[in-house]
A protein has these predicted regions:
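Acidic-and-aromatic substrate-binding clefts and catalytic sites of carbohydrate-active enzymes
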Residues: 9-13, 87-92
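Alpha-helix N-cap/helix-start capping motif
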Residues: 92, 96, 121-122
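A sequence-composition feature that detects small, non-aromatic residues
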Residues: 88, 116-119, 124
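Active-site glycine-centered loops adjacent to acidic/histidine catalytic or metal-binding residues
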Residues: 5-6, 83, 120-121
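Extended active-site neighborhood of metal-dependent phosphoesterases/phosphodiesterases
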Residues: 1-68, 72-73, 97-114, 124-169
Length: 169
């Protein structure tokens, strides 16, 4: 499963369509069920309709309507993936509108169907919770090396010895 990110296209001179073809993606946003969970993949690379500079980081009204429809049809706990964050500045420019959708489509008990949103755009590791939804930023494929002053021990001594750069990501 793939999530389109800004570095996958413009940074390397590829169009969204070329990137999707290379990854064999049939759709740029989609959902699927696995075991007892529902997964939604969003494309946060739509052009912003307002005057904008920089890379595209917007979710279109067409995609928002699809999201509402998709969420309303599932009864399973849902995890949302997007390259750009749905909670932080520098993420999806209309993130507050998207969060409102995620928070208002609830299960019968009134709890949000969405339990977590994962992203990686900010190249950092952290978790933030907003209105009962966990927003998880993962630095798993980052080119951001923070250096000796920010070393962090989280693996066994053997792994740290064999892969010393892990402590600086």
């Amino acid at each position: 499963y793939h999530v389109l990110g800004n570095h996958d296209m413009k940074d390397f001179g590829y169009t969204k369509e070329e990137t999707m073809k290379w990854w064999k993606m049939k759709k740029r946003y989609y959902s699927f069920d696995h075991n007892n969970f529902h997964f939604i993949i969003l494309d946060g690379n739509d052009p912003n309709p307002k005057p904008w500079s920089g890379y595209d980081r917007y979710i279109s009204s067409e995609q928002i309507e699809w999201l509402k429809d998709d969420l309303s049809k599932t009864l399973k706990p849902t995890i949302v993936f997007s390259h750009q964050s749905l909670e932080a500045k520098g993420g999806i420019s209309n993130r507050e509108e998207i969060r409102k959708v995620l928070e208002t489509i609830t299960n019968k008990n009134g709890q949000p169907k969405v339990i977590a949103c994962l992203s990686g755009h900010h190249h950092a590791d952290y978790v933030n919770s907003i209105n009962k939804i966990h927003y998880i930023q993962i630095n798993s494929m980052s080119y951001k090396w923070v250096g000796e002053n920010f070393k962090y021990k989280r693996f066994s001594n053997k792994i740290e010895k064999n892969f010393p750069s892990l402590s600086k990501t």
